[in-house]
Amino acid sequence: RDQPRSRGLGDVYKRQGQTFKNRIMFPPLTTGYEKNGMISEQDMGFYTRLAKGGVGYIVLGDVAPINSFSPTPKLFDDSQIPAFKALADSVHAYGTKLGVQIFHPEYDVDAINSLFMQKKFDEMRQRLHHDMMFFTDEASEEMLMSIIDKMCACAVRAQKAGVDVIQIHGDRLNGCLCSTRMNHRTDKFGGSLENRVRFARMLTRAIRKAVPDMVIDYKLSIVTPQRGKGGIDEADAVQFAQWLVEDGVDMFHVAQANHTGNMADTIPPMGVQPYGFFVKIAGDIKKAVNVPVSAVGRIVDADMAARVIESGMADIVAMGRPLLADPDWGTKIAAGKACDIRRCISCNKGCTDAIQNRQFLSCVLNAENGYENTRSCLLYTSDAADD
């Protein structure tokens, strides 16, 4: 069979002394694999399988620098470093770079934890619901500075674990502070664009100082007129990105802002958004900065991914659901077998639905996904068709 074009996807690129083996990125996703915030054997199997399949850059999503209730990895104590190091070593064995996405939720973690420890569950629920709407406006400057300190400490721990990249999460609390919809503050963190992005810029500069030799990736969460709330407005995104480069950002992951409650905004099922629906916006950022940019959003086959690279709209192609459906993208492309890639159908049944129901990430097209340590599938390939 004729092979789809894949030119450019196998090209290497370099940042801050790190060499990335190709242009294929697994973006930050909530997986549900962590046990009480600890890196689990399920994590190890899943991310190692992606690395073995040829992914060049993996980002571990939603890594919390505090002991939060988020069902995500946590790195707030030195005792957690060895598990992250084991994961980094495992993916490094296949030449893959590992990033951790550091975030802080949009609620007062210490207050919520205190109510939980006192078993005041009704009050805790009320406080959480309140904070999700108003913490952005009510957090004191002292608290915001404390959050920056904790995120920097998390970055240092990640560096000690051998992680290659720190990705700053541009959504959640950080994105809410940037947002014209969520930020109603009247102090130096609210109002004008310069004020709304002040926290993000202070955070970026602080992390740059804390880990001067590491690659800093920034998830640039953008609100469009149609979708999203907790991020920078599309009209302000270029200026914001240029400021962040001045502050020390080495690369951008351009994505739809997802603080909205509507998962179809950022993880659109079939028929809801066109293929590559955020690529043009990534291209607008790329034109304005001199650092690599990754694009994401319904990029589902090798030909489409190659066109993103060839067109100059992005330097890196990030694919979440497509790599759940087939983790062997990289090796199949390298072998000239791109037509064997199992294509994601955007059904959202094994992935998004599972996470929304507090289960773990899986895929209806890939029986291994989430069970990498106990299952192995023999896949049909074009070689078999030629026999």
Name each model-derived stretch.
Residues 240-283, 287, 291:
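Glycine/Thr-rich beta-alpha phosphate-binding loop at enzyme active sites
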